[in-house]
Amino acid sequence: MIVHVDLDAFFASVEVLLDPSLAGRPVIVGGTGARGVVAACTYEARAFGVHSAMPSARARRLCPQAVFLPGRYDRYAEYSTRFHEVLHAYTPKVEGIALDEAFLDVEGALRRGRSVAELGRALRRDVHAELGLDASVGAAATKFLAKLASEAAKPTADRAGTRPGAGVVVIEPGTELAFLHPLPVRSLWGVGPATHRRLERFGVRTVGELAAVPEASLVAALGPSLGHHLHELAWARDARTVAAEREIKSVSHEETYARDLRDPAELATEAVRLSDGVASRLRRAGLAGRTVTIKVRFGDFTTVTRSRTLGEAVDTAPVIARTATALLGAIDVTVGVRLLGVGVSKLTEGAAHQLSLLADGPDRAGRTDPRPGPAVGRPSGPGPSGPGPTPASGGRTAANSVSAPAPAAAWGAATEAVDRIRERFGDRAVGPAVLAGAGGLRVKRRGDSPWGPAAPVETAAAGDPGEASGRAKTAVESAERVVDTPGSCEDGDP
């Protein structure tokens, strides 16, 4: 039996825990600006039609009285760690798929004599006792049915008010199709808006109606991969098991900007900032990667990606940034860039083996860098490539980025020094010189308000009282979708 545990309205519920004055009020966490999106909201906000992934501007129109908060990723991560500790007390077979949800293989726990429903209720009690948060639990023989069951267990809300959910829903063996077939077809994994519209044109609105379509017809209409996938799910077939440790396939950062960027030099600087964040996360995870990918989304939402595979695995900002800026240089950005992303994939464990810093000319894989990266600094330290560290605001030190090639040994020593400084003094204590400004270093880190740029300070949370208002008016520089992808990149992320 597989169990799916999902914290209810996680980010918003944490905010209510941290500020009890928000209890009973519509609270929306996400990007507060025109290009922001809703990350989570309380059920009081859902009663007005607000939901996650909705544009923040629309959420504000639907529920103008809501408290809008930019979110505090670091605090959510703390609660997530405690949440997963509770789950591991039940079974070592825990597959975390987000900060607030996970799959559990509970076959071992069930052999101790309790039913899966009893185990689900105990899980909810322990999560609430440890975190003060509510969780919904679903159980079934397959992963996707367990997730559907947890969704069915959740509270619901409309203008009439919030109604508590069952808390625990178990789909017993033999009852799968009775549960599944009445559901709307959009409940299935893989049915996005475009596929949903296509299926509706064929008269398919429920999972049961989809199950009645021959697989060959689905393959002809949707393609072999999606057609077969949906046919299997419609008959409750899902062979995936709980993976206790999911392999990370890529590490990426991306950012949505409050205005479209058109200046190539400004975008090159942003590529350096994103590359520095990716490199730092790679090293902390003990990983290195061979393929560097950039993602560019223009103002009209057209999106392009470009990749280059290097001869060796890398984990340092200079080499990643140099590759990213070279890829960016081959794209016409003057039409305006809404979002920029940098990612590294084809990962390996252990130290990177960087024998060169992509000197001009063919790299070790035989590829030629089409243009040198922008001159954005030289390696820190007294070596031959630079005179030493560059002072940043507040007496901090800016290490450097990517202009001229440098010996691998020099970069390795510099990188180790940067990591030691950041471990002791924080991520913003040292970084690429090009990122230094009057306000200090603009480094990119995981959780830097991931849901869109902030609204202007005077409009971010008009009318929100107290501490909540102060947090909502906090300026948020950036938005990111950070993915440690357990498989192919999600939603186009590099």
Per-region residue spans from a language model:
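Gly/Gly-Pro- and Ser/Thr-rich, intrinsically disordered tail segments characteristic of DNA damage-repair
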Residues: 1-229, 242, 280, 362-379, ...
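Conserved alpha/beta core segments of nucleic-acid transaction machinery
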Residues: 352, 358-360
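DNA-contacting surface of Y-family translesion DNA polymerases
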Residues: 187, 195-338, 349-352, 493-494
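Short clusters of hydrophobic/aromatic residues that line enzyme substrate/ligand-binding pockets
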Residues: 38, 168-171, 185, 251, ...
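Hydrophobic, well-ordered secondary-structure elements that form the walls
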Residues: 294, 342, 426
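Surface-exposed, charge/polar-rich loops and edge strands
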Residues: 346-351, 423
